[in-house]
A protein has these predicted regions:
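Active-site-proximal loop->helix
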Residues: 80-85, 105-118, 137
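Active-site diphosphate/adenylate-binding microenvironment
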Residues: 1-47
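Conserved active-site and cofactor/substrate-binding residues in soluble primary-metabolism enzymes
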Residues: 2-7, 19, 48, 52, ...
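Core alpha/beta catalytic barrel or barrel-like domain that forms the active/cofactor pocket
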Residues: 22-29, 33, 103-106, 131, ...
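Thiamine diphosphate
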Residues: 30-104, 156-159
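Generic secondary-structure signature for well-ordered alpha-helical cores
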Residues: 1-4, 10-17, 59-62, 88-91, ...
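General beta-strand structural signal in soluble alpha/beta enzymes
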Residues: 23-26, 68, 95-98, 146-150
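Conserved thiamine diphosphate
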Residues: 112-167
């Protein structure tokens, strides 16, 4: 999370926007405190609802650069329906989905992206569910911009952020 935070903080000035015209909306989970560390407007929303709240904000305030910060549990479990609809509507908002394949904030429950057989506190005999593939889900929802990167490659991460910011629609 901190590597992504540092990359986003370093990249934001490139947008050339006043900080009061940038908003970060988060849900619940490991990534949810993200807006507190940005020198912009932000909202820490309820579990799974960040895409819905951000959609409302982006459609009512087209002058804002709206970013969603969410995790695999928040976006692909309780918030899955909101994520899918945000992607298919192609509203001008940017979604950063942190996929650590575990509910880290609650000390290790398996998540929708955990591998089969993953032993956690909630699956002591190993998880039975096949994992979601977030990229396939986004493509299936007909998202107009889909990218994947890794936090340890700052150069690539920043390039993906740049391309997402330039994309007119959901990225």
């Amino acid at each position: 999370d901190y590597a992504v935070l540092a990359a986003v903080q370093g990249f934001m000035p490139e947008l050339g926007l006043a900080r009061e015209n940038i908003v970060f909306v988060s849900g619940i989970g490991c990534s949810s405190r993200f807006p507190y560390y940005m020198n912009t407007y932000g909202m820490h929303s309820i579990h799974g609802r960040a895409p819905a709240i951000a959609t409302g904000l982006a459609t009512s305030r087209r002058d804002l650069s709206v970013w969603v910060v969410t995790g695999d549990g928040d976006a692909l479990s309780i918030g899955g329906n909101h994520l899918i609809h945000a992607l298919r509507r192609n509203v001008n908002l940017k979604i950063l989905l942190f996929n650590n394949r575990i509910y880290g904030l609650t000390k290790g429950q398996y998540s929708p992206t955990s591998e089969v057989g993953k032993i956690t506190k909630s699956t002591p005999m190993g998880s039975l569910d096949a994992p979601f593939n977030p990229v396939s889900l986004a493509i299936g929802a007909e998202a107009s911009f889909v990218a994947r990167t890794v936090d340890s490659d700052r150069k690539h991460l920043t390039e993906v952020l740049r391309q997402a910011a330039d994309h007119p629609g959901t990225a």
